[in-house]
């Protein structure tokens, strides 16, 4: 089968564009995963991950998507009937709740309007109401809505309780401020394919001493491939994974992490913030209403409402087929109502400006009267920032 892969500009909230040097790393020779060479590669990759997570906690690499890490976080800590407080501000917060239910736990939901963020005080109220909550889960950056949660402030609340604090940073690590140790995060998960700008297929997880105490006492664990104790044993004894890892994706992630650290976390976050401001300003200048509430807006993805009469499939079809630019649609009840532009990873000014220009052209082609040039307004923002 011949695969005709047309190179398109991925302006979706993952997977994101991958730098050439990262793609080239995947073409290195395959090595045995039970060799010293792979142990050295894995150890180096883990140490770089810890620098990006900003943690001294144990860190592990998983061959799987970010959902595998979410599953690992829940399956290793809960017993049947355990209560877990799930902060649900979008599709991925809901996924955490579904994982809890899959392992026969009791998902206590703090539901927040999609597009908004959770209030730390609301988390405190629920923790005060129940004295036996095993963990609190939250998604830092909800790509489904383009909104983010205040994980630092929520961490300040949760640290005063026995509950473990579990945070999904799949679409924020390497693009927004994450500090596992200072934010009191017990288990933090991420994926390779978003802000880190590596190909999809790897996930990472950090585990605190507080979390290990719970895991080691859990005699009702269900699972095999995602058993954290197995990962801990193999890494401590051999600097390996318990099961066959994706060797070539490890090469790729290692190089991607080099690029993150070379740019510097602070510089990288500021770049994401600039691009977010320019994207928002450009869309609003055209007359497009943003979806996420201003106080909660993500710096890695922007969500916007479709103007009346603009069909999702036609709009995104023009962008993809005519201009080779891919943006995302809405999920679940937001399908057909919003579109989402990812400006994460290695995305820069030219990608944002090109996307805004083509969004404007697509809207005009579909009969929408654009108020003013989004590109010009975005350029002004970029020049000021």
UniProtKB/Swiss-Prot annotation:
Keywords: Aminotransferase, Pyridoxal phosphate, Transferase. Disulfide bonds: none annotated. Its EC number is 2.6.1.-. Its cofactor is pyridoxal 5'-phosphate. The keyword Transferase applies. InterPro entries: Aminotrans_V_dom, PyrdxlP-dep_Trfase, PyrdxlP-dep_Trfase_major, PyrdxlP-dep_Trfase_small, SP_NH2Trfase/AEP_transaminase. SUPFAM superfamilies: PLP-dependent transferases. GO terms for molecular function: alanine-glyoxylate transaminase activity; L-serine-pyruvate transaminase activity. It holds the Pfam family Aminotran_5. Gene3D superfamilies: Aspartate Aminotransferase, domain 1, Type I PLP-dependent aspartate aminotransferase-like (Major domain). One of its GO terms (biological process) is glycine biosynthetic process, by transamination of glyoxylate. The modification N6-(pyridoxal phosphate)lysine is found at residue 194. Belongs to the class-V pyridoxal-phosphate-dependent aminotransferase family. This is Uncharacterized aminotransferase MJ0959.
